[in-house]
Every structure is written in C-alpha cells, then in structure tokens.
C-alpha cells in the first residue's frame, strides 16, 4: 500500500492488527510485533529487475502479494507474462485450471475478490501483460533443460516457478510462501524480494 503520510490502523481479514506508517508496516505476529517495508519501498528494486513491465501492474502484484496474501499466509504463484506469445502454453497443465472472473492486479478494487479466489485455489495464476488475471489453478511442468539448469533448494512452489521462468524468459513469477516471504523469479533466478516479517 502507498503511504498517505499518516499512520493508519487496520485489522486484516484474518483479524491481524497492523499499522501503516510512512516508514513501514508494523504487524502483530502472534507473539511479537514486526516491522517490514511497504511494497512501495520495494518498487525501485523490482522495477530495475523488470523494467519493461507497466508500473501499475508491478505495484499491484507487489501490493497484493505483500499486503494481502503474505500476512494471511496464503501461498500463491502469480505468473506475469511480459510479452504474450501465441501457442506459449507448453509447460502448463490446464486439467484443473479455472477461468478467472474479469479481474486485474492493477485495480485495487479487485484485490478482495482476488484474495478470496487465491485463498481457495492452488497452483499458478496467470496474469497478462496489462495485469488482467486470465486463469487460476494452472499446473506448471518443467522441461528437462530447466531441471538441469535450475537446481533450487526450496519448496515445490518455488522450484516450479523458477523453472517455468527459465523455460519462458518473457515471464516473471511472484511467489508467496505460506510462511510469508515473497520472492520474484526471472530466467530461473531469484532476482529479488523478501517481504515478510523480519526476513530482511
């Protein structure tokens, strides 16, 4: 969220109290208060890593991941297709996929609906170049080449997202761990971002 220069007090959907201040977010973690930067403070880092993406889409992805999904411990993989290409669904398993309602990560008014949908679905969510969410529940398959090239000591959600971005260089993945951190992958590499609690 963007800071208006004032301190805002909020109780999340999950009942967690938090304060938005001009310098960060103060959040109750169940046993102690934690301070973390806002998504806006991460924007220079993310824009530098993904300069061709529209700012409003990157900001929306960061806000949704770090201020909605992460505090609620909702694991998610958001695949942002920077340059759509025809017949580019290799590596995708649509057997459990669902068409998305007309929602966009660039529209803050859509976050509550996206939050609800992502809390009830697993696998990857596809986001087009303009921020439109096109599908939910898409499985990711790795090529043999990406399995060789990307050897990541992490959970399945992170490995599959990293390998997918290695196979699809025009796609970046925002991965939200169920324990909070948000990681951005591009070309098979973790290129930024740890946004939960005290992870740094």
Where are these regions (language model features)?
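Divalent-cation
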Residues: 1-200
């Amino acid at each position: 969220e963007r800071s208006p220069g004032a301190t805002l007090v909020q109780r999340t959907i999950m009942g967690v109290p938090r304060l938005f201040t001009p310098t960060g977010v103060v959040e109750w973690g169940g046993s102690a208060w934690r301070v973390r930067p806002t998504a806006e403070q991460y924007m220079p880092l993310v824009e530098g890593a993904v300069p061709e993406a529209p700012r409003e889409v990157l900001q929306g992805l960061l806000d949704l991941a770090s201020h909605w999904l992460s505090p609620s411990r909702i694991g998610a993989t958001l695949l942002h297709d920077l340059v759509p290409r025809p017949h580019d669904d290799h590596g995708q398993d649509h057997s459990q996929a669902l068409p998305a309602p007309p929602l966009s990560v660039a529209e803050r008014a859509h976050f509550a609906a996206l939050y609800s949908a992502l809390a009830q679905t697993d696998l990857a969510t596809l986001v087009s170049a303009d921020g439109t969410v096109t599908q939910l529940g898409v499985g990711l398959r790795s090529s043999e080449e990406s399995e060789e090239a990307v050897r990541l000591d992490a959970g399945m959600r992170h490995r599959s997202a990293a390998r997918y971005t290695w196979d699809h260089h025009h796609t970046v993945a925002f991965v939200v761990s169920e324990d909070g951190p948000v990681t951005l992958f591009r070309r098979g590499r973790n290129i930024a971002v740890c946004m939960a609690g005290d992870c740094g």
